[in-house]
Amino acid sequence: MNNTYRIPSKEFMDFTAFQRREVTKLAKEFVDIVHEYGKEAMMFLGDHWIGMEPFMDEFKSVGLDAVVGSVGNGATLRLISDIPGVKYTEGRFLPYFFPDTFHEGGDPVKEAKVNWVTARRAILRKPIDRIGYGGYLKLAVQFPEFIDYVESVCKEFRTLYENIKGTTPYCVKTVAVLNCWGKMRAWGNHMVHHAIYHKQNYSYAGIMEALSGAPFDVRFITFDDIRKNPDMLKDIDVILNVGDGDTAYTGGDNWTDETIVSAINEFVYNGGGFIGIGERPVISGKANTFS
């Protein structure tokens, strides 16, 4: 059993590569059947997508036409809108038309406003192509103020999309988030469940949220990426290493590798910025930590 906080072993990474190869192969069979009937194939990016990590190369081979997912904040929006190799992306905004919100005394308008304003800043960096809502329409129709607000959101989205789509937003700097996962977990760093607050990680998740709408070209890189090509750092202005000490997000024993240390030292010596947030990486067998 593994989770995104545990530092992955080579065996585990090999297994994830096996999963991607086999799952995407099977998924392509389903997509081909859909296409044979002249229909588009859309995947819902939900709480579980093992083997279908959308930023990995194998995903492109599936041939999906579109991806839709629930938008809880800016980071979850970028998790959808940044997906390459599909014709279009769609965000399903909150709240869902469910009884937990749409009941007597409930305030769906407030939830909708918070959701829209939170996600909107990320749309300005990389827009999704379509938006929608989901749930039981018979519940939503009982709240006419909510219907009116959704109409205003749709109009605002169209205005933003018409002015942004196809353009490259201004970027002050190129920022790379360095950890053990890289693009496999792009925009999903420190995300437990779906944009849900957790005391243990909200500060780290908040950094991803800030980046989702900030004027930066954000990349997600791994220690292995640096090992394979140290020169990749020449295209980066700032490296972020964010997380608790003994986790995949800071890197652990990766910092004992002279290739990594030398590459980072050279990067900083040549004017690059390195920002560590949280704890220093914990190196096994040593009382001190990397500094």
Task: State where each predicted segment sits.
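Alpha-helical scaffold elements within enzyme catalytic domains, especially in hydrolases
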Residues: 33, 121, 210, 263-267
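Short, well-ordered secondary-structure micro-motifs within conserved domains or adaptor modules
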Residues: 63-69, 230-250
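Short glycine-rich, flexible loops that bind phosphorylated cofactors or substrates
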Residues: 76, 247-249, 283
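Hydrophobic targeting/anchoring helices
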Residues: 5-9, 13-16, 22-32, 36-201
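A glycine-rich, often tryptophan-bearing local segment used as a flexible ligand/cofactor-contacting loop or short
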Residues: 251-291
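Loop/turn elements at helix/coil->beta-strand transitions in domains of secreted/extracellular proteins
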Residues: 37-41, 127-130, 172-173, 214-219, ...
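A short, well-structured beta->alpha microelement
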Residues: 43-51, 208-235
